[in-house]
Design a protein with these regions (language model features):
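An N-terminal structural lobe/cap that precedes and organizes the functional/catalytic core
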Residues: 2-82
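A generic structural micro-feature
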Residues: 5, 144, 174-175
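Generic structural motif
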Residues: 18-20, 155-157, 179
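Conserved small/polar residues in nucleotide/adenosyl-binding loops
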Residues: 172-182
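Residues at beta-strand starts and edge strands
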Residues: 7-11, 146-148, 181
Length: 183
């Protein structure tokens, strides 16, 4: 898997978007995010991390140590199950998981740390960006917080952007098609 990142690095990434919307704002009808004072386009850190996650998932294709924890439209507890299985808990019901963890903690008080280590060893995005392991709290576990070495801020465009809506025309009936053709 390679050495973990040990030093701090600062870098700039330039990317080009032409006739597109790199990060629509759901609160504004999915229009591009724009700084109202400067007119510069914005791309959130969440969007940039999603692009990195998608790239790693595509390139590494489930290689050991490169799974993605925060996936689009996939509940986190699906990945949590893999962590539970790594410590010998096969249960799927939350109540039974909690009971199994309680029983396991009597013989292994470091179960919280083992789960956290499993998550870091297997999930690229947790190891890279960090995570707050709150999904394990319902099983009476305290896996804490992982601080990732890679921190990403908002991206800003170099030049102001102009947001334009593009309208399309479609017809649903043959009569409408004939009318449009003769205009």
């Amino acid at each position: 898997m390679g050495e973990p990142i040990k030093n701090r690095y600062e870098f700039v990434v330039l990317f080009d978007v032409e006739n597109g919307n790199p990060n629509g704002d759901p609160d504004a009808g999915n229009m591009p995010r724009i700084d109202p004072e400067s007119g510069l386009g914005l791309v959130t850190d969440v969007c940039l991390k999603r692009k990195i996650r998608n790239y790693v998932e595509m390139v590494k294709e489930d290689s050991k140590g490169y799974e993605i924890y925060i996936k689009e439209d996939v509940p986190l507890n699906r990945s949590d199950r893999k962590a539970y299985e790594s410590i010998g808990i096969e249960e799927t019901d939350d109540k039974k998981i909690k009971e199994a963890v309680k029983k396991l903690k009597k013989t292994d008080p470091d179960v919280d740390i083992k789960l956290r280590d499993y998550m870091c060893d297997n999930f690229y995005d947790i190891r890279t960006f960090g995570a707050v392991m709150t999904t394990f709290v319902k099983a009476a576990l305290n896996c804490g917080q992982v601080r990732g070495p890679v921190q990403i801020g908002f991206a800003r465009s170099i030049d102001p952007i102009i947001s334009q809506e593009v309208t399309t025309v479609s017809y649903t009936h043959l009569r409408a098609h004939e009318t449009l053709r003769h205009l």
